[in-house]
Structure formats: C-alpha cells, structure tokens
Swiss-Prot record:
The lineage of its organism: Viruses, Varidnaviria, Bamfordvirae, Nucleocytoviricota, Megaviricetes. It comes from Acanthamoeba polyphaga mimivirus. Zn(2+) binds at residues 134, 137, 162, 165. A zinc finger (TFIIS-type) spans 130-170. This is Transcription factor S-II-related protein. Belongs to the TFS-II family. The keyword Zinc applies.
Amino acid sequence: MTTVIEFYISDKEREIVIEQLLEFFPKKKNCKDIEKGIYDFTKQYCKSDNSYLRLAQAIYIDCAKNIMFNLKDENNHTIKKIKKLIDKNKYNAYNLAFLNPEELNKDNWIKIIARKQMTEETLNQMATVEWKPCYACKNTSYHFYQLQTRSADEPMTTFYICKNCMKTYKVNN
C-alpha cells in the first residue's frame, strides 16, 4: 500500500497570512497578491523535490514569516522602497515571495559578505603547513594556529584548518 502525499495549504492558514499582511499594506488586494505569491512559491519549491511535499505547510509559514520579519524591520531600507512601490502599484506584490534574502535586505547582506571576505583574507594570511590527509577531502594543506587552552604548565593546543573544506582538527601536544 502506498501513501500519496499531495500539496495542501489550508484556507484558514492562507486567511491568517492575509490578515497579518494587512498590518503592513492598506490594500487587501496587495495582501492577497503577496499571499498568492507565497502559496505559488511554496508549491514550486515543493514540486522541485517531492520529498518536500510533507513540509509544505512549514515552508509556507516560513516564507510568510520571512517576508513579515523583513517588513517589520525599521532599518531595512530595501523592503521600505519595495513597499512604497507596491503601494503605488509600480511593483507587482506577487513577486515579493520570490525575492532572495539578499534582494529583501541588501544592506544586511553587504555586511555579511564583507565579514566573510575579511575572514577569508585573514585565513589566507595565516601560516600554512603540510600535514596528514584530511578525513573529509584528502587534502594535505592546512592553516594552523596555537592557543593556550589548558593550564600554563601543559603544552599549547594546535588547531589545524583544512584549506580545502575548512574542517578543523584539534591536537593536544
């Protein structure tokens, strides 16, 4: 016997999302368009890999919460611009659900990318050593650093970071 799982989001859940969106948009039509976008995004996401069908309700709620979280953020200038365009009917509200996180909050993602680049630059400036093959990727090139993690009368702990897969190994000498 096989169980068939179909895509389903309850009408009650959809109405709740529309009511929550009314807090941010004066026109109910815009809220319905955004909700329809969230619904279609969830459906498209679940159809891309049928194993996600069981999670349809959770994916739908997560997408709705993500949009509302960004709408509540006072410092998010990108979403404020999009909201004004939606209110003036110059931007299709339906498309809001299909925006990537970096499109919903550009300022935050610029900071995240800059932090990641700085971390990579710091890693590239660290000392490099050839050591035993990495268990994950078989690479033998590592960055390493030492920290005094235990009492002063014991040797320092050496940390090796694989340059290829970034897996960290700790060695107590």
